[in-house]
């Protein structure tokens, strides 16, 4: 990976900004086409938000409607109407960083630029901008790995054509992953940049900036989405495995791993402080593994420094064994420390720690993988379509369109090229006469004399004869075709700038080595002068024995341990660079390029020999070895992990698809056409895009004009209007997690449960509320609801049929949990058709019903026309 200059960086930034604004407009138009939000009133707009999205928008609305930002900020520290009657610190319990940032800038814009800006419009624009950041990073990431601008363009086009497989930002704009994934993607992209710089420079620079940037990205992701910690945990495990198996020097690896683990620790600390002490951030696998990774790497670094001071050579076997033990020990300590810290924190009373988040997701995984009976709430979450597994038919359609079909067409192209070369290699060459060959040699000789200004006396020199022989050999490889010879010569001359860059990098390394050698020689002269003054002149054999020792001392003194960069010995000594597996192929390619260089200029032969000899020992990887570099290995392994996660949870499949858009153009360009990029990007790119054009356009048309999409027809608007008109301002509601947050958002009525079922206390409350769908007795259900101080209970009429249709019916879930009650009828079905003491149906439409709960001391035999709710 070569470092681009300023103009290349600016050009990539300009192209990426173009994709950024294109994608922002793309998702904005899709959302407007699907919802027609500009024509809706405020209640209808807010009714579009369901589950936790409505809850988070309620927090943003409270921040935006205040006189200033800090007034709403203080109100969020003590909220009593989302888990009534308990008081909740929203900043500590929920992932509200996007709402805080958006509300802050909303107040800035409203007070200084546009007083008429609408809160929801401003919020949605912020969401579209975050989606644009994702596409911008996707383009830069693809360009970085493929080292070609068309690699980023290919990833962007694939992302847009199959947008239905990514995070559907236009369907759920307020989903937490829409805010967190841009920061996760930025952290992954910057990590690959740092790894590439280390491999190219063989030293670790900009350590403070790397720690700061990665800590900031990590903290922002952790404060925006609860799944971020799982993603970062997989990243740490991948980095631990791949760095231990790498061939880089131990000191360089240790320096980078220390900074990498420290960035995760600082990111966790920053997130913990900004969330006012969120206890869930204290006991995550990410924090435990990164902590022990930092500590054990410190031990490893001290062990390495001590062995160098003692002059011991590095034992590769012991190093590998230590790396394996260090990896296993880290995982063991990280797994064992979880329960210990939970118990210590709870007993000390420092923070109230529960296992809610992790235990909830572990129960879901156990239900999927082992088909075991888990809790009611875990079974309810597993039946959520967002957490369902990806259908095999849908997965096969994606694989067939993006992998099988393009690569089959690409295989046909490769096969045709192979047969063309095979037929050309087997064609007879005797068609040329000796006269034509001699004429071609004369043309080449004339060109050589004119270009190099060679006199007849210079023709006898060995250097000139060698250069001329190279030109004749190039002519022979072109079948003595003079026109082909000129084209081959011109094309090979164009390939010299990359080699010249490598040559200049090697010159810089040699210059640094010469400076170190000069310092060493001066010290040796001073030492010899001192010894000559005292003991006399030393013998040459003694000086030779002291050379290695003096050289090692000078190297130790030249290396500054406290500086901001760590420079390895392999960068100074080319002979210590590990050999590449494709060294023979590289020597042939360099010899072929040296032929063109020798024909191009008189002085190029000497420069090319220097460049060829230096490049063989350069630390820059060869063509075939670049695909095995650390940043490629990490990106590919991260895609495999994302694929496993996405296949298990449909909601997270966008992780695999987005990373696949980055990897797809890289594999082809690196494995097959590293040297001949023009062939790959002119032929292969066209083949790939043409194979995906038709299904891609179908997907784009389906996004703008969906055939299976219809607006929600559940009559929720009418129920919300009834609640606003016929209930008290402090009436307490409970109901299905899909709509209870919307009820709180639009009516501002207190609620006792919400959609964050991973929280243990909310899971228990939701189980009590959903007991109305079970077969329990009315007295038991009333006692459970009375403990929560519920006044109005919203029920879904579709779940009150007293029939079991599939395993995800609420009645089926309750039957699995309480098999002894299967002989009784469903309570909510009886509630809708009979008079039940302490329960009264006051509202019903085609989809929802509202039940008012009374104290058992109140008589329920009143007539319906005497109830104020029934007189409407």
From Swiss-Prot:
GO terms for biological process: protein C-linked glycosylation. InterPro entries: Dpy-19/Dpy-19-like, Dpy19. The chain crosses the membrane at residues 4-24, 126-146, 149-169, 179-199, 211-231, 257-277, 279-299, 326-346, 399-419, 627-647, 678-698. It is a multi-pass membrane protein. It holds the Pfam family Dpy19. Residues 508-535 form a coiled coil. It is found in: Membrane. The keyword Transmembrane helix applies. GO terms for molecular function: mannosyltransferase activity. This is C-mannosyltransferase dpy-19 homolog. The lineage of its organism: Eukaryota, Metazoa, Ecdysozoa, Arthropoda, Hexapoda.
């Amino acid at each position: 990976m070569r470092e681009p200059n300023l103009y290349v960086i600016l050009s990539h930034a300009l192209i990426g900004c173009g994709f950024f604004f294109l994608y922002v407009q793309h998702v904005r138009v899709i959302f407007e086409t699907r919802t027609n939000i500009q024509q809706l009133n405020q209640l209808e707009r807010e009714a579009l938000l369901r589950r936790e999205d409505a809850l988070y928008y309620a927090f943003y609305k409270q921040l935006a409607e205040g006189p200033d930002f800090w007034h709403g900020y203080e109100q969020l520290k003590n909220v009593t109407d989302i888990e009534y009657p308990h008081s909740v610190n929203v900043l500590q319990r929920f992932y509200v960083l996007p709402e805080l940032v958006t509300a802050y800038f909303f107040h800035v814009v409203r007070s200084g630029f546009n007083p008429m800006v609408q809160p929801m419009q401003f919020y949605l624009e912020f969401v579209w901008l975050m989606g644009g950041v994702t596409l911008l990073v996707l383009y830069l990431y693809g360009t970085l790995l493929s080292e070609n601008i068309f690699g980023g363009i290919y990833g962007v086009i694939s992302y847009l054509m199959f947008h239905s497989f990514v995070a559907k930002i236009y369907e759920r704009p307020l989903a937490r992953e829409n805010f967190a994934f841009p920061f996760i993607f930025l952290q992954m992209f910057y990590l690959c940049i740092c790894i590439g710089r280390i491999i190219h420079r063989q030293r670790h620079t900009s350590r403070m900036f790397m720690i700061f940037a990665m800590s900031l990205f990590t903290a922002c992701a952790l404060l925006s989405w609860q799944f971020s910690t799982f993603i970062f945990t997989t990243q740490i495990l991948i980095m631990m495995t791949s760095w231990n198996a790498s061939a880089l020097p131990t000191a360089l690896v240790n320096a980078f791993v220390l900074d990498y683990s420290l960035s995760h620790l600082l990111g966790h600390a920053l997130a913990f402080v900004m969330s006012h002490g969120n206890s869930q951030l204290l006991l995550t696998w990410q924090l435990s593994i990164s902590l022990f990774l930092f500590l054990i790497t410190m031990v490893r670094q001290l062990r390495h420094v001590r062995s160098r001071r003692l002059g011991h050579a590095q034992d590769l076997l012991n190093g590998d064994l230590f790396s394996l033990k260090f990896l296993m020990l880290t995982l063991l300590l990280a797994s064992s420390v979880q329960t210990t810290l939970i118990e210590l924190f709870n007993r000390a009373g420092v923070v109230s720690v529960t296992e809610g988040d992790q235990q909830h997701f572990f129960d879901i995984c156990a239900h999927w993988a082992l088909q075991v009976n888990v809790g009611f709430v875990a079974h309810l979450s597993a039946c959520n379509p967002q957490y369902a597994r990806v259908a095999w038919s849908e997965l096969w359609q994606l694989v067939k369109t993006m992998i099988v079909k393009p690569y089959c067409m690409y295989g046909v192209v490769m096969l045709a090229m192979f047969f063309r070369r095979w037929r050309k290699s087997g064609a007879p060459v005797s068609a040329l006469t000796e006269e034509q060959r001699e004429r071609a040699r004369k043309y080449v000789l004339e060109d050589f004399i004119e270009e190099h200004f060679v006199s007849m006396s210079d023709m006898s020199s060995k250097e000139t004869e060698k250069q001329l022989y190279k030109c004749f050999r190039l002519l022979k490889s072109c079948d003595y075709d003079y026109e082909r010879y000129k084209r081959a010569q011109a094309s090979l001359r164009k390939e010299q700038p990359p080699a010249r860059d490598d040559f200049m990098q090697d010159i810089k390394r040699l210059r640094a080595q010469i400076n170190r050698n000069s310092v060493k020689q001066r010290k040796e002269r001073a030492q010899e002068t001192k010894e000559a003054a005292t003991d006399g002149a030393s013998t040459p054999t003694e000086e030779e024995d002291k050379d290695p020792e003096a050289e090692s001392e000078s190297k130790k003194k030249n290396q500054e341990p406290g500086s901001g960069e760590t420079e390895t010995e392999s960068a100074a000594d080319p002979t210590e660079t590990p050999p590449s597996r494709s060294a023979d192929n590289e020597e042939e390619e360099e010899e072929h390029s040296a032929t063109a260089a020798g024909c191009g200029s008189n002085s190029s032969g000497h420069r090319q020999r220097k460049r060829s000899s230096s490049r063989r020992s350069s630390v820059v990887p060869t063509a075939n070895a670049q695909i095995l570099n650390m940043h490629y290995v990490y990106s590919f392994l991260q895609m495999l992990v994302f694929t496993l996660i996405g296949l298990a949870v449909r909601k997270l499949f966008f992780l695999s698809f987005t990373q696949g858009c980055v990897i797809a153009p890289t594999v082809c360009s690196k494995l097959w056409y590293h040297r001949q990029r023009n062939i790959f990007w002119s032929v292969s790119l066209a083949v790939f895009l043409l194979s995906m054009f038709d299904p891609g356009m179908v997907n784009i048309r389906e996004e703008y004009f969906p055939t299976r999409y219809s607006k929600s027809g559940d009559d929720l608007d009418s129920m919300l209007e009834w609640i606003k008109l016929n209930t008290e301002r402090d009436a307490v509601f409970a109901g299905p997690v899909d709509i209870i947050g919307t009820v709180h958002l639009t009516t501002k009525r207190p609620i006792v449960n919400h959609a964050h079922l991973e929280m243990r206390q909310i899971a228990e409350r939701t189980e009590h509320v959903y007991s109305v769908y079970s077969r329990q007795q009315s007295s038991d259900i009333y006692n459970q609801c009375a403990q929560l101080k519920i006044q109005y209970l919203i029920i879904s009429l579709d779940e009150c049929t007293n029939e079991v249709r599939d395993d995800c019916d609420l009645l089926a879930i309750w039957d699995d949990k309480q098999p002894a009650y299967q002989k009784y009828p469903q309570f909510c079905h009886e509630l809708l058709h009979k008079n039940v003491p302490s329960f009264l149906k006051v509202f019903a439409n085609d989809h929802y019903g509202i039940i008012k709960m009374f104290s058992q001391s109140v008589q329920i035999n009143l007539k319906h026309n005497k109830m104020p709710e029934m007189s409407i």
